[in-house]
C-alpha cells in the first residue's frame, strides 16, 4: 500500500504501489503510527497540534513477523506424539523467565535477540484451504527487536540472517522444523 485514499475525513480505500485503487468500507492498518499518520494518510488529516505530537513520538521496541509454508507440522519434542488439535492455539517459545530476560539483553546490545521469544500460530489446522494437503502454514510473531539497529545497518540488510536464526531457534525445540520450511515471507 502506497497511500490511504480519504474523502470527507474518512478512509475510503488504498492506492497500491502498482497504481491500483481498491475501495473499501473500512481500512485497517498494521504499521507504526508515524508511517500511518505521516506517510500513508494525507497530512491534512491531522491538525497542527496532532502533527507535532506524532512527530515527537518515539518508540524503540519492535517485533519481527514472518509466515512460513511447511511440508508438515512441527514435531516439538515437548509434544511428541500429539496430534493436530494441539496446534490450534498459540505455541510459545519462551521456556523460562531467564530466556525472556536474555532475549531483552541481547536486543539492547545487538538490536535483536539471539534466541527470540516466539509465538507461533498454525491456522491451517483450522482452515485446510490455507495449504495443500499434508502441508501447513505458520505465522511467527517474534519479540525483542529494536526498530533501529545499533550498528547502523538496516533491517533490509539483516532480515534474511534474522529469519534464518528464528527458524534455527524453533528447530531447537522441533527438530523437523527447518527441513519442513518450503517457503517464507
Per-segment meaning from a language model:
Residues 2-131:
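Mid-domain catalytic core of redox enzymes
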Amino acid at each position: 500500500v502506497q497511500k490511504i485514499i480519504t474523502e470527507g475525513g474518512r478512509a475510503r480505500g488504498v492506492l497500491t504501489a502498482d497504481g491500483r485503487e481498491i475501495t473499501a468500507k473500512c481500512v485497517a492498518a498494521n504499521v507504526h503510527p508515524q508511517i500511518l499518520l505521516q506517510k500513508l494518510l494525507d497530512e491534512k488529516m491531522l491538525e497542527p497540534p496532532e502533527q507535532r505530537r506524532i512527530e515527537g513520538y518515539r518508540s524503540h521496541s519492535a517485533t519481527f513477523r514472518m509466515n512460513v509454508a511447511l511440508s508438515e507440522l512441527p514435531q516439538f519434542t515437548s509434544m511428541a506424539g500429539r496430534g493436530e488439535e494441539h496446534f490450534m492455539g498459540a505455541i510459545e517459545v519462551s521456556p523460562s523467565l531467564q530466556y525472556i530476560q536474555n532475549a531483552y539483553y541481547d536486543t539492547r546490545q545487538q538490536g535483536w535477540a539471539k534466541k527470540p521469544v516466539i509465538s507461533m500460530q498454525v491456522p491451517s489446522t483450522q482452515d485446510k484451504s490455507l495449504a495443500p494437503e499434508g502441508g501447513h502454514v505458520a505465522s511467527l510473531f517474534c519479540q525483542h527487536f529494536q526498530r533501529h539497529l545499533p550498528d547502523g545497518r538496516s533491517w533490509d540488510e539483516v532480515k534474511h540472517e534474522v529469519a534464518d536464526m528464528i527458524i534455527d531457534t524453533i528447530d531447537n525445540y522441533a527438530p523437523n522444523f527447518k527441513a519442513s520450511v518450503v517457503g517464507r515471507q
